[in-house]
Amino acid sequence: MTIFDNYEVWFVIGSQHLYGAETLRQVTQHAEHVVNALNTEAKLPCKLVLKPLGTSPDEITAICRDANYDDRCAGLVVWLHTFSPAKMWINGLSILNKPLLQFHTQFNAALPWDSIDMDFMNLNQTAHGGREFGFIGARMRQQHAVVTGHWQDKEAHTRIGAWMRQAVSKQDTRQLKVCRFGDNMREVAVTDGDKVAAQIKFGFSVNTWAVGDLVQVVNSIGDGDISALIDEYESSYTLTPATQIHGDKRQNVREAARIELGMKRFLEQGGFHAFTTTFEDLHGLKQLPGLAVQRLMQQGYGFAGEGDWKTAALLRIMKVMSTGLQGGTSFMEDYTYHFEKGNDLVLGSHMLEVCPSIAVEEKPILDVQHLGIGGKEDPARLIFNTQTGPAIVASLIDLGDRYRLLVNCIDTVKTPHSLPKLPVANALWKAQPDLPTASEAWILAGGAHHTVFSHALDLNDMRQFAEIHDIEIAVIDNDTRLPAFKDALRWNEVYYGLKR
């Protein structure tokens, strides 16, 4: 069972009574056939539910009102099978607060050249019915997605499925609670921000709990539960000699297990699905949570270090979006560079907290090593390299008057040499279009040093995320040129200033 099983998407057919009962009967029949086929053949992440035809303003308004108040409804897919006068949709669309996708399709793929008549033409009017619907969306300044293609086309299935992921993630985000253990790292700017504005824009709440509250729960964990979790570690990871049963760091592993169990219990009891820690606020904890954070991220929790609640929330959102897809998604930080003509590289990592969902190794190494930052006992952590291939890094930043999503398309590569002294998980990548352009554009756009790294999602997913939440997006990819990128930032400043 996944999060998508908790939601459904309503399939709504637009028409009108002008065409008579027989035409509406055929429209309903076609709709039932299409919905059944999509549910069984399209591999969509959640179920489509066919609703009654929308043939009048009252019917359409009732559907939109019901969608708003049904917690299982993640959004609406609308198909204008015949012509459906768009003034009928104004009241419904004006109150609709769920995501909307217009499926610009028709029942038949090919025209019946020898038999086509006006009855056929009146029944299959998506070509201009869809344009009428599009006009009212533009006139009302309402953002909605559009997918064009025959309902049996696999590309259309893929695009509808990707939109469904966005719709479900938006509903999950409205209920998301972010727990901050302690505050932000002192004097850091980009990890701070307006939590009230974030809740108004996205729906997620951000609140702080004292580390002492967490410590109470951690200290309540029994030895039996710790031993059971250690057994799971033994079967899932390659333990270094120091962390094995008679190793000199075995107690550190047990303490890491205690912290993991306590953290998970605290998060579950509070209904939190994202959290932050900071190495400057660890009072009562024996080590900086490393292994615990890595494993919780792999279970779907959002996380970021140093109190960075925006990145923690974004990671949770992207975890939901990517559920069931190939590839992982993790908290990440651009840590250091490799400058080599024609082969500039970025080494990404963090002090400890990189999610094993992006690991190339089937069994990462579990080790305990010294960490000077935080001033605590040596923490346990998983060490691994990252899968290769196309990926993205994304940053959500607070500009005061709006949010900007910054995305850099990257290509992860195999580490050319072993890293025997690096005691943390890492990812190595080439930034698109090149490191100088990518880093300069990132800096000019105000991108954070913390990001969400993902092999599972791509630029199109993040564009849809920005559109569905109505926020700015700035893209750095192989098409990026700095003069044009700077111009786009200036134009966006004007556009969003006027939009306020």
Swiss-Prot record:
Single annotated GO MF: manganese ion binding
Cofactor: Mn(2+)
EC number(s) given by UniProt: 5.3.1.4
Gene Ontology CC annotation, any one: cytosol
Binding site for Mn(2+): E306, E333, H350, H450
Pathway(s) of this molecule: Carbohydrate degradation; L-arabinose degradation via L-ribulose; D-xylulose 5-phosphate from L-arabinose (bacterial route): step 1/3
Function: Catalyzes the conversion of L-arabinose to L-ribulose.
Assembly mode: Homohexamer.
Family the UniProt entry places it in: Belongs to the arabinose isomerase family.
Protein name per the record: L-arabinose isomerase
